[in-house]
């Protein structure tokens, strides 16, 4: 905005203010106007109250008339009754108002208050079935069912009609499992429903509670997840409000927390699903509001039941895997997808290696901190051949450093960069050394190290397990904290994160020192190598202490490995070996350059130099 525009706006503002002051009414005029407005408002308020009373009376009369003619008049009123089903792992509470599950307690897990974990209660959840009738629709949420056939593991919620017919909701809690079989069946209702009806509409809602210490970290792993038929599972965005109308038919829909889930499973698929996930504010006690609207099969004649299942339990990989075997449809539900184990190749490593190794070590009765320590050592031992190969590649480059320095001194000018590079590649080729020799071994190690990055935050076994100063390895260890929230850092400092960053800096310093071959042309890259460990403090400060502990131990072992390798490597013997290889290679090829990758790279550089020379010659013409 320029100066003239600012002056213009200022003048306009001055005129408006002056005009308002000039036309301001006197005190007497203002008093009369206020008295008039108060009188008008009083009359309007009395009229609004009269209309509201009339509307309420009319609504009540209409409701009474509707209720008295409804097929389910008797179910519109009643007293709420609660029924409990439980086994050794879960306790479920059912309400006859809506005939639904209204609370779930997981016996083997505790909340942050130390009591058995409440996954949800009546105020957190809702479920409504909408049945379309010929003359009226049934909305089950506000209707009162009659509990019958009650045992420790079964209950039938019956919605009775005035004509003697009924709709049954049958629930059966399976033994030693988190699964509940749920069946809907109509009886004597053929005349109520239209002949063409074959679906029921379902509205399922739940407020996902904050069950863990770290809100932001739990938010990353709390998502509405769904499984399309014959496809891999998918989920809505975890960090912002998301809504999706799914065109695929679905096997199941899950309201997922970081470590626990409520899952609704269809025997004959869900269709026309509309899914919504709304993040909640930190401090509200909730992570997200979930809503799922969908349809599924329904037979109004009652000849074929509508079969579904619930899973209320932990996101434990093998528990979910075993729950697949309880499927009524006999198809692989792939519930284990609720535990995110990373990208395809990393997921494969986690599924077949990491989880089995973790379970094996956990079976010894060791603390989870010791289990992570042993896992880190075992992983380091397994990748040691690749680590050794990578180190020896850098050691060979290091012993050739004097020759590289001679080439750098020979071609100090920038315009000689191509010749310098060409001669350097020729040197590597003579000695049989590849500057890329250490890259492939490092790439081979990456899937293993990345596997732990995805496994540890999703390992429910680490939840509420203490180690050293960390009371819970599944969340951050805030040994240093303060009241004010600092951007990017938060209100605490994780000691394991700090130790991880320090070891990373030391590892970087040592590695850069070992690999420095006198090439000063990449100072920006060196600076970046030192900045990244510092950035890790801000990135991982809110992550689980178990993950930071793993990276700290991994970095510490990495430094010790490099120090030991450096101490045990005789660089004079290594150089002598390279000289002997060079001589042998020269005799074998009669003084000509050898084959292999380095020779090909050298040939490509010569071809590049020839083409560049041709372009220069054409430019002179």
UniProtKB/Swiss-Prot annotation:
Its main location: membrane. The chain crosses the membrane at residues 1-21, 363-383, 436-456, 486-506, 527-547, 549-569. It is found in: Cell inner membrane. It is a multi-pass membrane protein. GO terms for biological process: protein insertion into membrane; protein transport. GO terms for molecular function: membrane insertase activity. Interacts with the Sec translocase complex via SecD. Specifically interacts with transmembrane segments of nascent integral membrane proteins during membrane integration. This is Membrane protein insertase YidC.
């Amino acid at each position: 905005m320029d100066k003239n525009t600012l002056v213009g706006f200022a003048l306009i503002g001055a005129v408006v203010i002056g005009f308002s002051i000039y036309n301001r009414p006197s005190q007497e005029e203002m008093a009369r106007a206020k008295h008039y407005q108060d009188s008008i408002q009083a009359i309007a308020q009395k009229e609004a109250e009269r209309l509201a009373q009339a509307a309420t009376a009319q609504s009540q009369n209409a409701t009474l008339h509707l209720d008295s003619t409804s097929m389910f008049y008797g179910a519109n009123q009643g007293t709420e009754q609660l029924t409990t089903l439980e086994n050794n792992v879960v306790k479920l509470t059912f309400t006859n108002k809506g005939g639904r599950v209204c609370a779930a307690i997981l016996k083997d897990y505790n909340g942050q208050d130390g009591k058995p974990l409440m996954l949800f209660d009546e105020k957190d959840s809702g479920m409504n079935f909408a049945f379309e009738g010929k003359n009226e629709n049934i909305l089950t949420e506000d209707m009162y069912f009659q509990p019958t056939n009650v045992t420790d593991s079964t209950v039938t919620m019956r919605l009775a009609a005035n004509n003697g017919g009924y709709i049954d909701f049958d629930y059966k809690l399976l033994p030693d499992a988190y699964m509940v079989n749920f069946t809907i069946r109509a009886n004597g209702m053929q005349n109520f429903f239209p002949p063409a009806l074959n679906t029921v509409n379902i509205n399922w809602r739940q407020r996902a509670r904050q069950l863990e210490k770290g809100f932001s970290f739990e938010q990353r792993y709390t998502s509405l997840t769904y499984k399309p038929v014959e496809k891999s599972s998918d989920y809505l965005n975890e960090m912002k409000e998301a809504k999706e109308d799914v065109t695929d038919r679905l096997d199941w829909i899950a309201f997922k927390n970081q470590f626990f889930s409520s899952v609704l499973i269809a025997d004959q698929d869900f269709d026309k699903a509309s899914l919504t996930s709304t993040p909640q504010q930190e401090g509200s006690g909730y992570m997200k509001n979930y809503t799922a609207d969908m349809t599924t099969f329904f037979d109004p004649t009652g000849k074929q039941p509508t079969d579904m299942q619930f899973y209320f339990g932990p996101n434990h990989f093998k528990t979910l895997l075993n729950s697949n075997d309880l499927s009524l449809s006999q198809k692989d539900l792939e519930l284990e997808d609720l535990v995110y184990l990373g990208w395809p190749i990393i997921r494969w490593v986690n599924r077949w290696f990491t989880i089995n190794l973790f379970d094996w070590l956990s079976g010894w009765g060791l603390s989870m901190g010791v289990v992570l320590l042993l896992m880190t050592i075992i992983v380091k031992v397994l990748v040691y051949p690749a680590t050794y190969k990578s180190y020896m590649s850098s050691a060979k480059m290091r012993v050739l450093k004097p020759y590289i320095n001679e080439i750098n001194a020979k071609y100090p000018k920038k315009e000689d960069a191509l010749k310098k590079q060409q001669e350097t590649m020729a040197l590597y080729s003579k000695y049989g050394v590849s500057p890329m020799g250490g890259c492939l071994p490092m790439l081979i190690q990456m899937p293993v190290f990345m596997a732990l990055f995805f496994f540890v935050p999703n390992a429910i076994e680490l939840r509420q397990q203490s180690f050293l100063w960390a009371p819970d390895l599944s969340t951050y260890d805030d040994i240093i904290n303060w009241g004010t929230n600092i951007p990017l850092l938060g209100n605490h400092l994780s000691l394991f994160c700090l130790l991880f960053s320090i070891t990373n800096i030391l590892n970087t310093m040592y590695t850069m020192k070992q690999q420095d071959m006198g090439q000063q042309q990449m100072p920006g890259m060196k600076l970046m190598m030192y900045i990244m460990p510092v950035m890790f403090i801000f990135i991982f400060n809110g992550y689980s202490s178990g993950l930071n502990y793993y990276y700290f131990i991994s970095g510490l072992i990495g430094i010790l490995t490099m120090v030991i390798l450096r101490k045990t490597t005789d660089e004079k013997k290594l150089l002598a070996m390279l000289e002997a290889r060079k001589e042998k290679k020269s005799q074998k090829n009669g003084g000509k350059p050898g084959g292999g990758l380095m020779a090909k790279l050298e040939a490509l550089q010569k071809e590049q130099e020839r083409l560049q020379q041709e372009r220069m010659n054409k430019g002179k013409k």
